[in-house]
Amino acid sequence: MPAGDLTRLVAAALALAAGVAAVVIVALLLSHTPGPVSTAAAAPAAAASQAPVAATPHVPIPAAFPAPPANAVVFARADGSNVLALAAGPRGRRLLLQASVLGPQGKGVRGLDVSFTVRQRSAHAAACGAGCYRALLPVDGQPRAVLVDVRGRSAKTRWRVALPHRWPAADGSALMARAGRVWRSLRTLSFRERLASDATHSVTSVWRAAAPDRIAYTVTKGYSSVVIGGRRWDRAPGGRWVESSQTAPIHQPVPFWVSVANAHVLDSVRLRGHDVWRVSFFDPGTPGWFEAAIDKRTLHTLELSMFATAHFMHDVYSGFDKPAGIRPPG
């Protein structure tokens, strides 16, 4: 993972845990626009040992991170302050199932009791590493859904996951590559973001980005910033704009994912008047699980969800190549 992205995730998690007073750290780092904030908190995570990911061997992730098996279809959700993810893939007449449980410190959660049920057949999962629980389940015909049952000392979660209507699911790698190129070709982009670290702590913000080096955001009941090239302006709630130097160059608009593995088309749906593909994938570079809604006509990413270490994000995108109006504050 690039150092800037690692710092972004760690600082975001710490800021959310600290509360609204620290929300400026979240906003600055989520934008890929480093500002005048401390990054010392990122050091422990950066020192984590590394291990290759089978699906993308050139992208290392922490050894204690429960990455999905290669080629499996992936799903993810928040479960308290943890990420709960499912990977499913055909293995002949059996179904390979893996639950990944990622804790808020970026390591897999051990010692859980996990089972899977498909069409009234159940299997107990065996541990396959930190936060990794895996089973092979015989299936007759096409599997429609998986029931994931996770039990721990103080928690119990039952999660029903609908599988793609087409099985095996269609590969989405080429589609995500095209969507990434379209994103990088945009002149402007706007989006609304909700970022949470658990069920209690969350912030909402509105963003505008313009090529090649302009971005502006406003956090609900929080900070605002404008970045233009090498200058930035920041404003605390109820305060005045303060001008300073932008400490690192930025390039916008760019996708939030770093790399793509395990990409599959989940289904086709209608979203806000657009025909879209829903695509899920794992990003070893973040690392985290993503789901994107891709417009079939334009290949614009209309919505994006991400589940990473203490970092649960949902973005809704609009204003593609529309005037963004990013100027120095008056």
Predicted regions located by residue number:
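Beta-strand-rich domain onsets/edges
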Residues: 30-31, 35-46, 50-98, 102-110, ...
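An acidic-aromatic
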Residues: 200-254, 312-313, 317
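Short amphipathic beta-strand segments in non-cytosolic proteins
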Residues: 115-125
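Aromatic sugar-binding surface patches on proteins
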Residues: 128-135
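N-terminal leader/targeting segments and the immediate start of mature chains
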Residues: 36-48, 52-56, 164-212, 327-330
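Flexible, processing/modification-adjacent segments and terminal tails
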Residues: 170-175, 228-285, 329-330
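Edge beta-strands of extracellular beta-sandwich domains
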Residues: 155-166
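Gly/Pro-enriched, hydrophobic low-complexity segments
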Residues: 194, 216, 274-330
